[in-house]
Amino acid sequence: MNKSSILLYHGVTKEKNSVGIENCSGKHMDADVFEQQMKYISENKNVITLRELVRLIEADEPCPPDCVAVTFDDSFKNIRTVALPILKKYNVPATFFITTAMVGNNRLFWVDRLEHTINRTDKKLLCLEGKYYTLRTSTDKIDTLTKVKRMLKSERPSKRNTVLK
């Protein structure tokens, strides 16, 4: 079997200037970089759908040389408004994993709400479940975001919502 790659994205943005720690995890790629990547793979790789890649693997058939599939997790609006036109321009198929609970509303994912809340707070100290987190600098905020996100990932949604209020 030939090697294959799956390129996973979350979002694509035209926003050049983040504020504070927004997008500190790099979840949203710059549109110009994304376009360069799609142009490159469309000209230099065999781009197939994830469905076709799975079918080949399950059938124990060889993948085309330099085989690539493109996927998007989550359901950010910028996938439709920014990424999709670029994908169409280069005729790159993609698989979209949509978080259905987010469709049709303007709520943020809990991790994005957490990032936004920590980024926008004027507080210098956060006490959460008996632990103290410093929020004086962007570095402090990123460190706090990482630690609190790790802690909340294993919690029930109701607990996350309580913490985020």
For each feature predicted by the language model, list its residue ranges.
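C-terminal domain-boundary segment and adjacent tail
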Residues: 26-62
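Extended, charge-rich helix/loop segments that form flexible
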Residues: 107-165
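A short alpha/beta connector and helix-capping loop motif
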Residues: 82-100
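Structural preference for beta-strand elements that scaffold enzyme active sites
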Residues: 4-6, 67-69, 93-95
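Acidic/histidine-rich helix-loop elements
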Residues: 14-29
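Conserved, mostly hydrophobic/aromatic
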Residues: 7, 41, 73, 87, ...
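Membrane-embedded segments
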Residues: 71, 75-84
